[in-house]
Amino acid sequence: MPIENYFGKKALIIGLGVSGRAAASFLQTSGVKVLGVDRDYLQLENQPEILELKAKGLVIQADCETIDLKTFDLIVVSPGIPSNHPLIKKAHEHKKEVIGEIELGCRASCHSIIGVTGTNGKTTVTLLITHILNANGLKAKALGNVGTPLTREILTLDFQEIAVLELSSYQLDTFQQQVLDEAVVLNITPDHLERYETMENYAKSKFQIGKCLKKSGKLFVERKAAVEYQHLLNFPHSTYGYLPSCHTYTDLCSVFLEGMQQFELPLEWQGKENHDLENLLAAYAICARRGIKPQQFLQALKTFQKPSHRVEFVLEKNGIHFYDDSKGTNIDAVMRAVQSINRPVFLIAGGVDKGASYVAWLNVFKGHVKKVYAIGQAANKIQKELSLHIRVQIEANLDDAVKQAYQDAKEGDAVLLSPGCASFDMFKDYIHRGEEFKRLVKLL
């Protein structure tokens, strides 16, 4: 139903995090009466944004058992709320419409939209596409899981402005509007298995993006993911990767599109398969479809700054290099981070376990990682799975891990924070964790 048809009606928002608050504000602006439910209401009630929403009529409660779903015309669920939440199950039983904040924003949008998903690299590719488009006169804004909810911006975007949406699997679970002009699936590796239980379920969520394309839309998929999950790709798509059979590919010297050479890679990009190069291919596939010429892409690439906490060099002290990869929150991200550092590595890992095995690290760590410092809730599991093959030391906190790693490392080594886990056992989020790591390193 178009958003204007909800004027004067009632909406229930489940979860009042960043996207839930944005959805509440958006609905209030659209003339909708809003009830929000959040189990952490007592911690939220005095926050400025919540107070502002309440002043405009938002009603909030923590208890979901007393809610009568029959009185609501629309139910909006926040990304972190699992599909087995009692209210969601009850809503489906009552045949009530349940959507996410992204779907809500798209219903009010007449803009051109690009979608970006995958396990690792989503934020970087979203920001890179946005940067390339803006640098070449195509006004664009990065929204969604990158940090700014779509509903917070959609009513103020210029008519010609392009929305570049970073989409998590959680957001895709409640997104079905066919509004995307282009979309890309970057890679699919183990993550969020505490929610999805199997890789098959996780991959299905990622490939939901293909169902959100316009009829004229174009989907690009990283080749390995396309091969492994071919049975889930029951819609048209093109691949990118390292083989000439891909729509967009590289031979590690140049980039090709449909077999035609586009440009020679800058020297620092040549010679080695890596995560950054795959991100570049994904961004170029999208940008080329938007009319960006090869040299325009290369010129804009020179001024792109990679977002923080992604194998970010912090400083060098006594010949030891320190790197912050706090955004490395899954198994594959840690392996990519370790492979990107051309020094012996002392690795700080751990946090909230996400259901995958750490054994996969061993093939990459052999001869490269000298020692692992395990922290947080996952520390014992990391030690149990790795300690027969590599030195693992459990530390009480990040502070102790940083100090011990610095003490053990010597000139020419690297200390890398790449947790492979979520952050919320000890930190507010991965940004808080990364900033704390930097602070501790600077105190050494």
From Swiss-Prot:
The gene is murD. ATP binds at G118, T119, N120, G121, K122, T123, T124. PANTHER family: UDP-N-ACETYLMURAMOYLALANINE--D-GLUTAMATE LIGASE. It comes from Protochlamydia amoebophila (strain UWE25). One of its GO terms (cellular component) is cytoplasm. This is UDP-N-acetylmuramoylalanine--D-glutamate ligase. Its main location: cytoplasm. Cell wall formation. Catalyzes the addition of glutamate to the nucleotide precursor UDP-N-acetylmuramoyl-L-alanine (UMA). Pathway: Cell wall biogenesis; peptidoglycan biosynthesis. Its EC number is 6.3.2.9. It comes from the Bacteria.
